[in-house]
Amino acid sequence: IWYLFRDNLLPRNTKFIGYARTKQTLAEVKEKCKKYIKVRTGEEDKLEEFWAANDYLSGSYDKRVDYEFLNQVISKYEKGPIANRIFYLAVPPTVFEDATLNIRNACTSIKGFTRVIIEKPFGRDDKSSDILSKDLAGLFKEEQIYRIDHYLG
């Protein structure tokens, strides 16, 4: 995401909101990411712009109230007439169903599109993957779902 931001390949005013079970601050997330983000000389200000476009909150995957709070956090950044939302899911199969259901029920955009990006493989085997795919199809239209291979990224 840093490279896309750095190279101006994302829409202006894009915001990044991290959501996970881990209770931590954005400063802690930033510190943990330092060793993975390559910053060339002269890009320090751009990196600060990137971090200013980030937010983080922790919550459970199975409690709708946490997703309602996530929706409030997202909404505070949506100032214009159009506000698209993309959810990138890199979650264990055990929480996939709860996470997608709560996104659908509490975090769908009312001012633009909602997309869900899912890292494959998801599920423990073909059978569980098929079950998760059917659940997903009941929550989102096919054009809202993007599947990517974790290893090919």
Swiss-Prot record:
GO terms for biological process: glucose metabolic process; pentose-phosphate shunt, oxidative branch. Keywords: Carbohydrate metabolism, Cytoplasm, Glucose metabolism, NADP, Oxidoreductase. Its main location: cytoplasm. It is found in: Cytoplasm, Cytosol. D-glucose 6-phosphate binds at K120. Pathway: Carbohydrate degradation; pentose phosphate pathway; D-ribulose 5-phosphate from D-glucose 6-phosphate (oxidative stage): step 1/3. It holds the Pfam family G6PD_N. GO terms for molecular function: glucose-6-phosphate dehydrogenase activity; NADP binding. One of its GO terms (cellular component) is cytosol. It is an enzyme of class 1 (oxidoreductase). NADP(+) binds at R21, K120. It catalyses: D-glucose 6-phosphate + NADP(+) = 6-phospho-D-glucono-1,5-lactone + NADPH + H(+). Transmembrane segments: none annotated. Its EC number is 1.1.1.49. Belongs to the glucose-6-phosphate dehydrogenase family. Cytosolic glucose-6-phosphate dehydrogenase that catalyzes the first and rate-limiting step of the oxidative branch within the pentose phosphate pathway/shunt, an alternative route to glycolysis for the dissimilation of carbohydrates and a major source of reducing power and metabolic intermediates for fatty acid and nucleic acid biosynthetic processes. This is Glucose-6-phosphate 1-dehydrogenase.
